[in-house]
Amino acid sequence: MAGQPVTRWLTEAVPRGRIAAFRTLVYLFVAADLVVFTPWVRTRVDVPGDLYQPLLLGRLLPLPTPTPALVGVIFWVLLVGSLLAATGRAPRLLGWTVFALYFEWMIVAMSYGKVDHDRFGLLVALAALPTAGRARHGDPTRTQAGGWALRVTQIAVICTYFLAAWAKFRFGGLDWATGSVLARAIIRRGTDLADLIAQVPHLLIVAQFGILAFELLSPLVFVLPERWRLAVVGFFYSFHLVTIATITISFAPHLVAMTSFLPLERVRPVSLLRRRRSPASLGQLGDHPLAAADDDLSAAPLAQS
C-alpha cells in the first residue's frame, strides 16, 4: 500500500530504554519549569480578570478564568505529578494528567499578550508520551509505540524552525533578513560577546540570512543518514548555545524536546551510580587494574597487645 512507507517511518521502532530516558528528562524539566523558568505564571492572576484573553484553544474549551486558588492547585498537583511521572510509574495515568495540567498552565501563561513558540515540541512530547507504554531504563527491546512518540516530537521540533521562517516571510518578507532584527535584540538584551560581534561590518545581516536558511532547510534532517542527522542536531544545539551567549534567549523547552533525536538509551546515570556504590567498586581491590598479580590483598592481622 502507498501509505506503508510513511507508516513505517512514523512508527520506526526504538529501544524502550530511549523512551524511559526521554520520559524522565521531559517530566523532570516540567517540574523545573514550574519553579525556575515559569514561576511568574502564578502572578498572572494578580491582574484584573478582564485582561485574560485566552488563546484559541482556551476559547474553544470551557476553561475558567484563572484565579489564585485554581493556579495554586495546578502548580502543586502538576509539580508532584511530574516528579512521579519521571519515575516511569503509571505512564498513562500520570502522563495524561501532566499533559492536561501543563497545557492549562501554558494557556494561563500565554493568554496575557505574549505567546512563546519554544514550547510546541515539549507539548507534543507530553501528549505523545502517555501512548508509548511502559519502558525501563536500559531496556534494549524495541517498541513502535515509543517510536511514534519520538517521531511526532521530532516533527514538532522541526516545525518550530520551519514555521518560524514562514512567519518571518509572512510578516516581514526579505526585510526581516536585511533589517535590524538582531541589532535591536542586542541593544535590548545583548551580552558583551554580542557587543563584540555587532562591531563586525555586515555580520548581523549575514547571520539573519543564515538563520532563515537553516530554518527553511531544517526538514532535510529527516532524510539524512543517522550519523549526519546527529551532526545536524548538534548544529541546532550550537545555534541555541550562541543565542544564549549573545542575546540570553535559552529555548530550554525546545532543547529538551530536541533530545528526541538523540540515542538517550546510552546515558544511564542510575546504573553508573549503582556501579560506583557497589561493593566491587568500593572494596574489591583485587579487580582493580592497578593491583599487581603478586600483591598480598588479604586482611592484615590484628596487632597483639
Question: What positions do the PLM features span?
Answer:
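Alpha-helical membrane-anchoring segments
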Residues: 1-305
